[in-house]
Amino acid sequence: MKEIGLNLYSVRNLISTEEDLLATAKKLKEAGYSFFQYSGAAWDPKRIKRMVDEVGTPVRLTHIPQDRLLNETEKVIEENLSFGNNNIGLGAMGWDILTDEKKCKEHIEKYNKVGEIMQKNGCKFFWHHHNFEFIQYNGQPIFDYIIENAPYINYTLDTYWLQLSGVSIIEYLEKLKGRIGCVHLKDFKTKFFIDEKEIPRFVPEIESVGYGVINFQDVINKMREVGVEHYFVEQDNAADLPDTFNQVERSVKYLKKEIK
């Protein structure tokens, strides 16, 4: 692979100040990343533009808080366009609505309207899913309901959360053909340990790309087939580990060396 991006949320512990952001962005570029998703640091369009201009790494996706997406849609569009980005996303749907089908569906309709406004202004709205979108109402996953009923919503498909949900990554790529402009690449592994009560535990864990169980060559072949434009490594847990930079560096090295 040639062009690979990183969701900066993965290194949020390294970008807390403007100077840290610039230094980390330069280091990530040297490691092989070509562009970024801006997330996980203070929202300042001027700061973001400075990074884009000085480091030469465009921002091709952002995650914006729910209240701003819903109540300041036009302002959010203006801010993103100021640093050259027209892909604007929701990081996660609200937990508080998951147990209320009516409220959840009303919420989805509001985001569909956000997507319509963005489309009219030359932007696209992207929904980043997790595993909880696979909660079912009357036998249908929430995610499938969104796909069928919200035509102005595009998707940032996430390999880890699909794997954890127990669904086929390939099948959802096909199902969303033409609506997946961005993807999050992160690997999946099972961690084994014995807890304090001496009970064996098996828990899912995010891993660097190529170091878990997902067949990324097959997955990326399908992503190319369905028209994915922007590939972002995302490792939510990297910022909590002592070797944060190494965690994301080995992902980009794997993708550049091993994926044809």
Protein language model regions, located:
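C-terminal helical cap(s) of enzyme catalytic domains, especially alpha/beta-barrels
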Residues: 242-260
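Aromatic/hydrophobic pocket-lining residues that form the small-molecule binding cavity
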Residues: 21, 45, 73, 104-107, ...
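Hydrophobic faces of well-ordered beta-strands that scaffold small-molecule active sites
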Residues: 2-8, 36-38, 59-64, 88-90, ...
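N-terminal pre-domain/capping segments
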Residues: 1-86, 256-260
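Active-site acidic/histidine proton-transfer and metal-coordination neighborhood
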Residues: 26, 30, 54, 58, ...
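Acidic/histidine-rich catalytic cores of soluble enzymes
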Residues: 120-213
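H/E-rich (His + Asp/Glu) clusters that bind or coordinate divalent metals
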Residues: 214-220, 226, 230-234
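Acidic-and-aromatic substrate-binding clefts and catalytic sites of carbohydrate-active enzymes
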Residues: 13-18, 35-47, 64-73, 95-99, ...
